[in-house]
């Protein structure tokens, strides 16, 4: 149940943790889907840690295009309603899905970044629902957020997650993100201990990152489902990533299309 205080916290801080938003059945379905993807990775899979640190920081995206369980999570789980409520939007269109698995003993961090500068979309009503599939704390890579940073009014240059990917973002004329870790006391950094089925809902402009997984045996599997709301518009500007399937949208158009389906409200 989303409360008024949850919505107010999201608006103020840019992030909120919702407890047990996904029941045990959803957790088990998604864990099984993750293991299938790890065993037979999709065409967009990568190991973000490759070339920098030992371990495996597995990432994949667009799994909903070929896996029915990821598709069900994106379109039919509690996530669309959560996203619409938090965005204060009358509608929600599914944007894309992204999987992050930090295996034990993987020191590679998730760099501090905002999401929206990577994406060919503009607007305020853009959010992610990040579902925990394992117990998570800071030792195995809890996501950290700078509360209120979604309202700083600055777009930072996209930061590559993997060594050697810097060239992808050289077209961006945005300013580099500050060195947050050089003086963490300057910022209101938030993170949550999470249980499987908890989710984080966070604004596309909030500055966030995560440490590595320093544990010997605690995995950190997280599925992020991205949604856009009423005011979002397609914006394929230079320096953003391109989708593997080009959306049938003109620049400035609302996001709804076959690639970004309307998921809230549910069709009658």
Language model segments and positions:
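Short, charged/polar surface micro-motifs in flexible loops or helix N-caps
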Residues: 79, 89, 104-106, 136-138, ...
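Short, conserved beta-strand element in jelly-roll/cupin
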Residues: 120-138, 193-196, 201, 226-229
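Short, solvent-exposed loop/turn segments at secondary-structure junctions
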Residues: 23-24, 100-102, 117, 136, ...
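A short beta-loop-beta micro-motif enriched in histidine and acidic residues
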Residues: 114-126, 187, 194, 218-220
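Double-stranded beta-helix
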Residues: 138-207
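Active-site region of the double-stranded beta-helix
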Residues: 90, 116, 131-142, 148-150
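Non-heme Fe(II)/2-oxoglutarate
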Residues: 40-52, 155-161, 196-201, 205-268
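Non-heme Fe(II)-dependent double-stranded beta-helix
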Residues: 1-13, 18-112, 117-120, 238, ...
